């Protein structure tokens, strides 16, 4: 099974502020949906709570250390390892956040789907340093800022060189 991380990063690898994404880019939301639809998504509890519901068209697995925590429409796992063990029959597992789960999953990741957002913003959660791990760019496309997207962004797919 491929382990893939998908994230949108502003300058300095910023991914969040106060458990929210500090931008709204419809182009990135469309990209996220296109990449993840039909694939299982693994997320931390706080990420799930910030989304507020299971993502439709995807198997949703939430990692929570609280054994009593549950939510309708999701599977709960006590760790990343346990979450991935639930998905052994899948071709690709998509790790969708948050920061702690990205940091834990990154050393095992085979692929990164990153949206680079051309914005200098303030926040408290960052994507871990990934450049030193050796990646090959597979694909890159650009979306300019427009009336619906406040910032230009690039969609980049990277594959781990092993």
From Swiss-Prot:
Keywords: Antibiotic resistance, Methotrexate resistance, NADP, One-carbon metabolism, Oxidoreductase, Plasmid, Trimethoprim resistance
Gene3D superfamilies, sorted: Dihydrofolate Reductase, subunit A (3.40.430.10)
Gene Ontology, cellular component aspect: cytosol
E.C. no: 1.5.1.3
CDD domains assigned: DHFR
Family: Belongs to the dihydrofolate reductase family.
Protein name (record): Dihydrofolate reductase type 3
Lineage summary: Bacteria, Pseudomonadati, Pseudomonadota, Gammaproteobacteria, Enterobacterales
């Amino acid at each position: 099974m491929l382990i893939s991380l998908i994230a949108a990063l502003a300058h300095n690898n910023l991914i969040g502020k106060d458990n929210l994404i500090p931008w709204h880019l419809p182009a990135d939301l469309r990209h996220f949906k296109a990449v993840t639809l039909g694939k299982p998504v693994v997320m931390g509890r706080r990420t799930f709570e910030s989304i507020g519901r299971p993502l439709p068209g995807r198997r949703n697995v939430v990692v929570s250390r609280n054994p009593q925590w549950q939510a309708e429409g999701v599977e709960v796992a006590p760790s990343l390892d346990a979450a991935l063990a639930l998905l052994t029959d899948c071709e690709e597992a998509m790790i969708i956040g948050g920061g702690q789960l990205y940091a834990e999953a990154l050393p095992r990741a085979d692929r990164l789907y990153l949206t680079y957002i051309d914005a200098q913003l303030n926040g408290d959660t960052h994507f871990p340093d990934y450049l030193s791990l050796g990646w090959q760019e597979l694909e890159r496309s650009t979306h300019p800022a427009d009336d619906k997207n406040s910032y230009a962004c690039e969609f980049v797919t990277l594959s781990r060189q092993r």
